Amino acid sequence: MKKKITFLLMFVLSLSISSAQNTFRFGTSATPEGKTLLVDSKGLILDGKHIIPVMGEIHYSRVPESEWRREIRKMKAGGINIISTYIFWIHHEPEEGKWNWSGNHNLRRFVRICAEENVMLVLRLGPFCHGEVYQGGIPSWVHEKAGQNPKYKIRARTPGFLEDCTKLYNTIFAQVNGLLWKDGGPVVGVQIENESRGPWDYLESLKNIAVKAGFDVPFYTRTGWPALRGKEIFGQLLPLYGDYADGFWDRKLEDMPGSYADAFIMRDKRMSSAIATETFSKEELSEDSPSLSSKLSYPYFTCELGGGMMPAYHRRININGRELKPLVICKLGSGSNLPGYYMYHGGTNPYNPLHTMGETQASPGTNHNDLPHMTYDFQAPLGEVGQVFETPFHEGRFIHQMLTDWGSELLQMNVDSLSRHYARRGAFEFYNDYVRIKNESGTSHVTFKDYRTGGATIDWTTVEPFCKVDDLIYFIEIKGKKPQISVDGKVYTCKLNKQQKAGKLNVCVLSYEKAKTAYKIDGKLLYAKNGGILYKSDSCIVEEVWTKSSVIAATVTEVKKADAPRVVPMGRQAVAAQPVEEDFAKAAVYTINYDTSGMNNYDNLFLRINYRGDVARVYADGRLVADNFWNGKEMWVRMADLVGKKVELKILPLRKDAPVYFQKEQKAMIEATKGDYMLGLDSVEVIERHTLEFNDAF
């Protein structure tokens, strides 16, 4: 009987794989070693087994080349197994024909490191990327061509523009040639364009250009928003979706305007109506692709779940960290089978002496908002300089580990029950009533219901599944609930952090704090002993810990007091305009000094600046290296960019009547300040990153 069941399962799986090959018009799915990666209407199939992977975005050209390997390892420690990255055209070809693929722009080296670290990679090719980059990543010389030739239209199926896109795709492919999945490399997919209305033949032309260039990969994608103009040919490009906890792009200066709260409910609609609302109409963000209701449907994947968010000048969003878990819980409960985060790791824009490399209202393209010139921290789980935002990092990691161990089963389970706060998929129950700002006391969790395992049935739990180690099932407590597991009709109340029997099952419920130290590495559950994060290095386990330096201190001297604050003007897009360089002549100026004598490596040293004001900038020998729009959080600066140079911190005062959105906590700070404006420097600390290495006995 067992042989018959096994044969039947193999037959059904072979039909599924065959269907995937026939349904979607994608590239080579097998490596030279015979590993396969396929797509069907449910999800991804790796070596014949359905999986629910987790994708996280990092931009290599916004992170120092020397940090790539370590930061990729930290992303993997957080549960990321597919990395996505934009290839910003403007970063690589700022002048026509003059390409830069060196240093932080060395795409080939980044891809090789992904291969060496055994993580899959999706390349977002452009030509338009957005990413809060100047002109969305399209170089100025392209805009100049469009201005000189009315037949040359950007992001359109016009000969001149498509010729330049062909050069772009060919040049990108030359950098990754030999590193695709079919070559045994990490590149499993490419995204064509970004947030494009189409029409469809424009996207189809770009895909054909990519394929002709050599991008023969297991799948091709596009963003599933906005609604496309023209009928889509099914199976050419996977639409990937997103949702954000809040949006800097919104025009309104109020808490959670529009439909941001909808990101925190279960729903059967895939398209968010809250992404890029400054660009797209409500109608363009309200229609799912017609193909979704067709007999042959796409799997439900996301590429832009935003637990973090950038502050724009006019909208200073402060992410508290609790937003990420409810977002992914709601998507999984609604049937999604690939969480993809934007951003998972922040970064810093490359310096350009001619203009900012961040989005600005004054540019000819992507000009709806003013973003910082340099910082792109995004309040992500891993921040601009690699600092850990603990709540989203760990709460996301718990779910990602659960998906690693139970994702193959979850993927096979359809949505059986769906309401605003509750969903059930087979043996998994999803619950969320947390809503950013509107219901901060809410909770979010996933639990078992009638789950058959190890010869027993888990009837229900008040704890969340975390991981499996041999025959031991680890759970994590849900705060405020008694930790209980019902097995075969009997209820077991669990002691935290103690292994015990629950009927036929071996279980252990970790406290929330203990779980934050627990990492499953090579089939073992290891614990960080110093409050840091654990990741695997070449020959050992590394614990990374960040502390205030005990050997180096910064001294700050005020050299100029601020002048009266500027009157904040409105920009071209009718929202507040950020200050220009000339405005900083009115800033308070401080010099920052520190003694690093005897040190020859500064890569692990950072300044953490706590200030109050409008905008802060740090200059090294007169060159801008860091900036920050105040939203109540600290500013981070790499000391490697400062050592041996004259360091100046400039802070502009914040007018109380500035036409800028702040959340209630920041509003209270502003209103509590005496006078007409707020300005203060509370601390400048040197933070040191330590890496502690352990052998197998760890």
Residue ranges and their predicted role:
Residues A20-I82, R112, E671, E685-E693:
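N-terminal carbohydrate-binding accessory modules
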Residues P150, F161-N177, D183-Q191, R197-A210, ...:
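Carbohydrate-binding surfaces of carbohydrate-active enzymes
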Residues S140, S511-G531, D538, W546-D563, ...:
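Glycine/proline-rich low-complexity spacer/linker segments in large multi-domain proteins
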Residues G598-A620, N628-F629, K650:
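Aromatic-lined ligand-binding clefts that engage carbohydrates, nucleic acids, or primary amines
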Residues N118, H130-F280, S286-P311, S336:
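Active-site region of glycoside hydrolase catalytic domains
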Residues W68-G136, K207, V211-K212:
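Aromatic-lined substrate-binding rim segments of carbohydrate-active enzymes
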Residues Y86, H91, E95-K98, G103, ...:
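Aromatic- and acidic-residue-enriched carbohydrate-binding clefts of CAZyme catalytic domains
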Residues M1-Q21:
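Bacterial Sec-dependent N-terminal signal peptides
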